[in-house]
């Protein structure tokens, strides 16, 4: 099931053991190498400390929020050595410029949709400049079109670029 970015922030974290809220998931931790949500920055309900909830510890996404087994699944950021680099990047997708491989500027990421069964970001929604909005509107980019991601821009395959099909190559058609 795809979820938009605004529905992935400020979520209650519910404990299945106690049946109550144990934390609030403030914003997702996005891995820019594979566009996967690796976890969430959380605010502890009791001590108000910042903790990390890993995606592997989420049992289900219910209307009340994110369901986890117990409070023990929340980790202190310093304990997550393998994720330290990703956590320190604090990569945020919204607002990043999107250009094509031919250096044509498409706009900026205004929203994204993530598949909550795999935690991969599937679609990027690009808001275009005003002069392009009148004729084109909002662009949707699938994750398969992405070539490269850097902290300040995303490079995608140009949609106007003609790709020769393998059948056309065999027949000698240009």
Regions found by a protein language model. Name each.
Residues 1-174:
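Peripheral interaction segments used for macromolecular assembly
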């Amino acid at each position: 099931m795809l979820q938009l970015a605004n529905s992935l922030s400020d979520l209650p974290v519910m404990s299945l053991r106690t049946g109550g809220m144990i934390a609030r998931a403030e914003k997702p931790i996005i891995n820019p190498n594979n566009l996967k949500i690796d976890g969430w920055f959380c605010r502890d309900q009791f001590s108000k400390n910042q903790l990390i909830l890993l995606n592997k510890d989420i049992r289900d996404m219910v209307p009340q929020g994110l369901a986890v087994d117990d409070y023990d699944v929340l980790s202190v950021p310093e304990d997550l050595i393998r994720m330290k680099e990703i956590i320190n990047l604090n990569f945020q997708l919204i607002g990043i410029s999107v250009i094509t491989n031919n250096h044509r500027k498409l706009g900026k990421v205004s929203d994204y949709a993530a598949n909550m069964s795999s935690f991969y970001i599937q679609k990027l929604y690009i808001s275009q400049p005003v002069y392009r909005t009148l004729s084109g509107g909002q662009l949707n980019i699938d994750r398969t079109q992405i070539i490269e991601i850097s902290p300040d821009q995303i490079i995608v395959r140009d949609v106007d670029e003609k790709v020769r099909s393998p059948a056309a190559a065999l027949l000698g058609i240009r």
